UniProtKB/Swiss-Prot annotation:
Main location: virion
Subunit structure: Homomultimerizes to form the nucleocapsid. May bind host exportin-1/XPO1. Binds to viral genomic RNA. Protein-RNA contacts are mediated by a combination of electrostatic interactions between positively charged residues and the phosphate backbone and planar interactions between aromatic side chains and bases.
Protein name: Nucleoprotein
Motif (Bipartite nuclear localization signal): 198-216
Gene: NP
Posttranslational modification: Late in virus-infected cells, may be cleaved from a 56-kDa protein to a 53-kDa protein by a cellular caspase. This cleavage might be a marker for the onset of apoptosis in infected cells or have a specific function in virus host interaction.
GO biological process per UniProt: symbiont entry into host cell; viral penetration into host nucleus
UniProt record similarity statement: Belongs to the influenza viruses nucleoprotein family.
Length: 498
């Protein structure tokens, strides 16, 4: 990307840091995940969890959610001002699963938020360590991306459910900062903007007064984030139009939906980071690994290496397939929900199947599910190779877009073609090229029409052996060119509901 110079790297976003060199970045990311690990160990001690219980991904998620809730200033304030029956605004908790007499038992725990904040700060050298909190949010977001489909949310905002590959990070909370904005897909940003515009249409005062001024600033900031994800001049120019609109209405919604569709071929740059569950960092810290001294990167070999020697368990429902549960967790760990299955399968070393063929439900277990029949199994999170996570979207030939398929947003920087059904996508662009954005629309459609499904993206990029930590010998896989690689193809997953 041309504007690379103005951007901070992910790690800088992740750690809130100013310009740092590679070593400093590795150290500060290491400090961040080390803090998460120390916090997790301390929580296991507080809760008197056995080694096996501490490695249970469901327990990890409960502990992560507790600390996120303890630091959710806005919600805490809201809860204190609007007391609801049976909810103590000063407490947080969730289900903890314990092994008793050969069975798994659920225990609901409750903690003072103040106490959780104290433990978190203590694990992070007395600091609030917001970067670590964002990291946990992104892990939860990646898990949601792999587990649920957002068809209903897409349809509600007037978008096409086939645009699901653009929806990375759609469940991230608003307070996830720059690191959160980097991992949001084009569709996610478009959906947030459309919701905002719709509120403005229905509520006259939304853009007015002191509050309206703040709203307007937020609107323009979101427009700029989305603009920064687009890689062609025409798409960016259209975003300028949307941003500068005097009072945003249906014309802007139309433009945004057009841009979202165009991103299926002229893909946006969306960051990918391997964010692992807290228990994985905890295990490493407990075994004496010093993250800050060794350094750590979210986009290189480190997460792969960490997963190679971490044993994590998951609760399994009676008719679920443990191998499928592992695939879900693996995809979440590597932020690969929207990656081409051919690439994921090659890296993982076992076939990654589309979600419609998975016999597994989500990782989290509802409070009304019967624990009597629950079993646990080891999650297989290891990989055969590792690859660098990308943020380019695979459009390496700048102005002329490369191919994109309905439903791929590349995660790994690995050479492949991005097959797509041009007819399906282009059918969505019927006629409407009048109005202020007509020349940009025409230009965007022209670029989309010239894209070829057989074009290679990430030329010369390959995967690496796990012993090759400096990425010296890329192995460039060859893929069956015609093969569709979409995870959401023929999908029957449940909807994500808050």
């Amino acid at each position: 990307m041309a504007s690379q110079g103005t951007k901070r790297s992910y790690e800088q976003m992740e750690t809130g840091g100013e310009r740092q060199n590679a070593t400093e970045i590795r150290a500060s990311v290491g400090r961040m995940v080390g803090g998460i690990g120390r916090f997790y160990i301390q929580m296991c001690t507080e809760l008197k969890l056995s080694d096996h219980e501490g490695r249970l991904i469901q327990n990890s998620i409960t502990i992560e959610r507790m600390v996120l809730s303890a630091f959710d200033e806005r919600r805490n304030k809201y809860l204190e001002e609007h007391p609801s029956a049976g909810k103590d605004p000063k407490k947080t908790g969730g289900p903890i699963y314990r092994r008793r007499d050969g069975k798994w038992m659920r225990e609901l725990i409750l903690y003072d938020k103040e106490e959780i904040r104290r433990i978190w700060r203590q694990a992070n050298n007395g600091e609030d360590a917001t970067a670590g909190l964002t990291h946990l949010m992104i892990w939860h977001s990646n898990l949601n991306d792999a587990t649920y489909q957002r068809t209903r949310a897409l349809v509600r905002t007037g978008m096409d459910p086939r645009m699901c590959s653009l929806m990375q990070g759609s469940t991230l909370p608003r307070r996830s900062g720059a690191a959160g904005a980097a991992v949001k897909g084009v569709g996610t940003m478009v959906m947030e903007l459309i919701r905002m515009i719709k509120r403005g249409i229905n509520d006259r005062n939304f853009w007015r007064g002191e509050n309206g001024r703040r709203t307007r600033i937020a609107y323009e900031r979101m427009c700029n984030i989305l603009k920064g994800k687009f890689q062609t001049a025409a798409q960016r120019a259209m975003m300028d139009q949307v941003r500068e609109s005097r009072n945003p209405g249906n014309a802007e919604i139309e433009d945004l939906i057009f841009l979202a569709r165009s991103a299926l071929i002229l893909r946006g740059s969306v960051a990918h980071k391997s964010c692992l569950p807290a228990c994985v960092y905890g295990l490493a810290v407990a075994s004496g690994y010093d993250f800050e001294r060794e350094g750590y990167s979210l986009v290189g070999i480190d997460p792969f290496r960490l997963l190679q020697n971490s044993q994590v368990f998951s609760l399994i429902r009676p008719n679920e397939n443990p191998a499928h549960k592992s695939q879900l967790a693996w995809m979440a760990c590597h932020s690969a929900a929207f990656e081409d299955l051919r690439v994921s399968s090659f890296i993982r070393g076992t076939r990654v199947v589309p979600r419609g063929q998975l016999s597994t439900r989500g990782v989290q277990i509802a409070s009304n599910e019967n624990m009597e029949t629950m079993d646990s199994s080891t999650l297989e999170l290891r990989s055969r190779y590792w690859a660098i996570r990308t943020r380019s979207g695979g459009n390496n030939n700048q102005q002329r877009a490369s191919a994109g398929q309905i439903s791929v947003q590349p995660t790994f920087s690995v050479q492949r073609n991005l097959p797509f059904e041009r007819a399906t996508i282009m059918a969505a662009f019927t006629g409407n090229t009048e109005g202020r954005t007509s020349d940009m629309r025409t230009e965007i459609i022209r670029m989309m029409e010239s894209a070829r499904p057989e074009d290679l993206s990430f030329q010369g990029r390959g995967v690496f052996e796990l012993s090759d930590e400096n990425a010296t010998n890329p192995i460039v896989p060859s893929f069956d060119m015609s093969n569709e690689g979409s995870y959401f193809f023929g999908d029957n997953a449940e909807e994500y509901d808050n």
